[in-house]
Each structure stands twice: as C-alpha cells, then as structure tokens.
A protein has these predicted regions:
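Bacterial Sec-dependent N-terminal signal peptides
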Residues: 1-23
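Extracellular/lumen-exposed scaffold segments
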Residues: 20-151
C-alpha cells in the first residue's frame, strides 16, 4: 500500500511538472510565402517569467536542447535545417559545468519549406524543449506542431 501511495505521488508530481513547462512556453506559428511553392514557417516561443529555453546547440552535455522533428510529407521538401532568430545568451552555468546557450523571453525558429506542387498541405511534427530559471529546471516538454501551407 505504501509503495502504491509513493508511486501515485510521483506520477502526480511528474504530471504537474510537465504541465508547468508547457505553461512556461507558449508557441505561435506563422507562414509567409517567399516565392512560388516556397514558404517560410516561423515557430515563435514566448517564454514566460524568469525562465529561459535552451538553444538547439546547448553547448554542453546536460540540459535538453530544443529539437524539431518533422513528419515526412511526400508533398514537401525541407530546405535546410531550422534556424534560430533571437538574442542568444551564452553563460557559464556551474550546474552544467560549462557555457550554455539559451533564450529569454522570445525566440523565433524558422524552417523553409518547398512544395513539390501547388497544393494545400501541412508541416507537422513536434518540438521538444526544456526551460529553467535560477532555482529549478522543469522536465523536458514536447509540443505538437501542425501548420497549413500552400494552396
């Protein structure tokens, strides 16, 4: 019985922590047509409070980097990798034993997508990220992405 209670407390605490990290970052998406069959997909993270979100290239082992994974779509071609647009902070963090790269308040991630034909489709996938403040880190979170393009 004692083990069941401890397990339930652990599960509840984990669920609350994941919910906190999803509230710490709000995602907005926008699509801009660059040329015929070429689109710029912007994925903007608005980071609340004193939290910071780690970059795609964190700089050290330890904190979870931001990772975008897109679902294969036979109608699209990803042109290059996701680019970060924002003011990166490079700071030594003793807990990680080195210099880390992260963003405060906001960062925009940009992916260029080319369509194989003039059709309406979507860019789908997920983004995994981790946020911390000066006192704590929240568990890594995963948010689904679905952005309509073309047409």
């Amino acid at each position: 019985m004692k083990h069941n209670l401890l397990f339930l407390i652990f599960v509840f605490t984990s669920l609350v922590s994941v919910a906190q990290s999803e509230k710490a970052v709000k995602w907005n998406y926008a699509v801009k047509k660059l040329a015929d069959k070429t689109y710029e997909v912007s994925m903007t993270a608005n980071i609340s409070g004193d939290y910071h979100m780690y970059a795609q290239n964190v700089g050290v082992d330890g904190p979870a980097p931001t990772i975008f994974t897109f679902t294969k779509n036979p109608l699209t071609i990803l042109d290059g990798s996701v680019k970060e647009v924002g003011k990166v902070v490079k700071k030594f963090e003793s807990v990680w034993g080195g210099n880390v790269n992260y963003y405060e308040k906001t960062v925009n991630f940009v992916q260029i997508v080319k369509l194989k034909a003039n059709v309406k489709t979507s860019l789908s996938g997920k983004v995994e990220f981790m946020v911390c403040d000066e006192k704590q880190c929240l568990p890594p979170s995963t948010v689904d992405i679905k952005v309509n393009i073309g047409g």
